[in-house]
């Protein structure tokens, strides 16, 4: 119940920011502090949780990934996780933004959005941590080269959400690339069928199919792929869009 109330509060604050064109940085501080307090409250019950979805809590993530990530890190006793996140947009809603604001670890974020650095920087206190911002279109052909060039640390948390050829990009990653792995899957494909879009250069979901719903991979395809890379499936968020390993 508290998580639902908190989620509604966050949505209301975001709406007010957009509608009245208010100072986002000021309200982001409010969201961060409220979210941190709720996370601390939730942590009291971590020992009683039997599924990831009980930890579901949205602060700066798109859905409830912030809470789930904190829960997994707590279980693994990781305090300051170095991370890579691919597919962050302008970083306002992402899986690692709250994490970076909270403990300021080393991080690398990658997206193809134009003027990425200019869009990301206003939202963060860069002097407190080491965050690299790389503007690139990620494919199965360049993923390892980009990581080799820009990631000079051991990865604790890896997250990918590019609404594209995610399956094929993941397939090129080395096994056990990180302690925690998060990937978006396409719930439209259903939970049982092993489905992915073809590995097309320059794939764009709005051009591949008129519905704009054909992208990524099914949950089953993702689980089977991650099993080959020695990962264990932990579960999904409540919205059943992100899988955790």
Label every PLM stretch briefly:
Residues 32-37, 71, 223-225:
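Short, hydrophobic/amphipathic alpha-helical patches that form generic packing surfaces
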Residues 82-85, 98, 104-106, 150-160, ...:
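Conserved acidic-Pro-Pro-aromatic motif
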Residues 1-54:
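Membrane-proximal basic amphipathic "stem/tether" segments
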Residues 49, 74-75, 200-203:
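A short alpha-helix capping/helix-coil boundary motif
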